[in-house]
Structure formats: C-alpha cells, structure tokens
Amino acid sequence: MKKKALLSFFIIMGFFISACSHQEDMQNDYMFKEYNKGDKIILNSVNGGSKTLIRTDKGFVIEGEENKVLMIDFFGTFCSPCKEEALELSKLWKNNSKKFTIIGLTHFEDVSDETVKKFADDYGAYYFLSNDLQNDRIIAQILKDINYQSMEQLPFKVVMKNGIYQKLSNYWDNNTSTNFYLGKIPTDYIQNDLDKIYKEK
C-alpha cells in the first residue's frame, strides 16, 4: 500500500515539474468570437514564412497541407518544459515532415517576435512558431472544441487529422486515452501515436 501511495506521489510530482501553469488573472477562454466553418486565419512564423489555418466542422487544417497531420502546440518562452522539449519537437517534425507539421502558438505572455525568435534560436525550435494576436482566439476555440475544463498549463498540444481531433495516449495514465498532451511528453511516445494515426483512414 505504501509503495502504491509513494508511486502516485512521484507521478503527480513529475506531472507538475513537466508543466507550467499560469497564475495571472485568467480570462474565461469561452468568452470569445467563435470561428465559422471556412474561416481562414493567416499566421506568420518568427522563423519565416506563413501558413493559413482553415476552420473545419470540428477543428482546423492548413491550406495546401490538408493531407498532413497537424499538431498545435501552446507554449511560452518563459516555460522551462517548453524550452526542454523544443529541440526534440524540431526533430519529430523533421523526421515526419512528409506527413506531419507543427504550429506553435505563444500563450500566457505578451512578448515581441524577437523574443520568440531568440527562444527558437536558443532552444532549437525550428518548426513554425506564431506570436500572433490571433493566437489566444485560436487557443480558446481549440479548448472549447475539446471541452477542456481544467486549469491551462504549458506545454499543451492537440493533434488533428483531416480537421478532426485525434485520440491520444494519456502519458500520465496509461489506462486511458485523451485528446491532448499536457506537459512535457517524450517524443518517442508521441511518435507511437503518430504512427497509429497515419494508418487510420
């Protein structure tokens, strides 16, 4: 019994170490103008280039890359787990680039593009990073789409295929599935989920 209690304690502690919460005044993320099907959102990356998100019935796709699995990552330049996983996410993206893409959205902060670019350079985040004013609205829409009711923490990721949120393995509870990754998740764990998603029609 003591071993089980001790194990549970370490799992919970590991979770809090692997995620950043934000204690500022948290606005109700459901108080926003929802996107309509077909709405287009142009995002610019601090690493160069732009992508257009298109609203689907239940999610988003990237214009011109509709056939790719899309991961949207909420992150902060202040967030230690976000820094720690950035290079690994870059490798994940490069290793899967024909079938998969990542869009990182800054959240919980108001910083310059230069600050986000420095984060990218310092920690190897070479995938698409948006520091756009529209980020919070996109994030609010995603949280409403998946009916997320808990405190927001970073990093936070969702995965979509054909504009539909995918079921993902729950790193913190192996007996359940979920539709988001919360906290720093090993990329080999994410890769296993991606391999399953690729095979599904």
Regions found by a protein language model. Name each.
Residues 1-52, 167, 189-201:
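N-terminal targeting signals for export/organelle localization
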Residues 43-70:
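A short beta-strand-turn-helix
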Residues 71-72, 157:
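Hydrophobic beta-strand anchors of alpha/beta hydrolase catalytic cores
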Residues 72-79, 107:
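Aromatic-flanked redox-active Cys/Sec active sites in thiol-based oxidoreductases
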Residues 77-84, 156:
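C-type cytochrome heme c attachment motif
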Residues 83-124, 136-143:
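Structural microenvironment flanking redox-active thiols in thiol-disulfide oxidoreductases
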Residues 120-162:
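Short, internal strand/loop/helix patches
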Residues 153-201:
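Thiol-/selenol-based redox modules, centered on thioredoxin-like
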